[in-house]
């Protein structure tokens, strides 16, 4: 028997948390979500990624954002920079037949925990990542 939700998105396996960075691009809904892909309990947060054309049937894509030296990946949002105002994408070069790529930009909170003199300290900062193929992100 399958006990998975029929309408609500759920990851294929392990911990899932808040939805983040939902955006609609060229007929597809992109859903990012806090996710710990290695266990069923809370752990170092990543951003999972799934896409849907109808909000009912979802395809889970590779992990979008991994924890790094700045910390775990917490809440954030996304924007599709269709006009490449940020300059993070590429531009059209018509005489060479090159079509530019607009970036999908993720803005999120990096959460780092350190210990100094036995005391736990937390540092949060805003971070940015972008993708020109809507799957693989550069930080």
Residue ranges and their predicted role:
Residues 1-139:
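Beta-rich carbohydrate-recognition and catalytic domains
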